[in-house]
């Protein structure tokens, strides 16, 4: 009788150990899954996060009133591509264009605004469609910016080039409103301001007056 009770106790102990082992495995699997699978991030059509998170705020100002040589345009396009390819995930890019329509009200609005959703690098192939992520990155982010700038950097000509006004406008409407911890403004211009109030091409105006 005692032997039978001992056997039953031993069997119960084994069963308890088995349950504990199974429970440990389940806990490990759950923890691994939570750490392995990234939370889903909702994005708008411009690939920016719906929760408003922006890692870096970057503003391009393209002076389309400038005349760039073929070699200068090629250098600019290569530099822009390097910047875009090294962009951080959730970095937001706003492209402003300064052209001969600057005096018109809507000409100061951004040409495009788009965020970097990531190209799939560093993500697991088991939980992500890397090819789809890369295609989305190329079509909705990379090509959006590079093609825009390639089309704008060329044979621009205009009677005015109010670059300082555009810098001020971008600073107020993009930089000051952004909650990003890091911000930068990238200018593609000869930086020669020219309008009736002030011109770098002449010395007849007082810069302090313009300010």
Region annotations inferred by a language model:
Residues 49-52, 84-87, 173-179:
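Surface-exposed acidic, glycine-flexible loop patches that form ligand/cofactor-binding
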Residues 2-73, 85:
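Acidic, polar low-complexity linker/tail segments
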Residues 192-211:
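VWA/integrin I-like adhesion module and closely mimicked acidic/polar interface patches used
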Residues 75-82, 168, 206-211:
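N-terminal post-signal-peptidase region of extra-cytosolic proteins
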Residues 63-64, 170, 182-196:
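DG-centered beta-turn motif at the end of beta-strands
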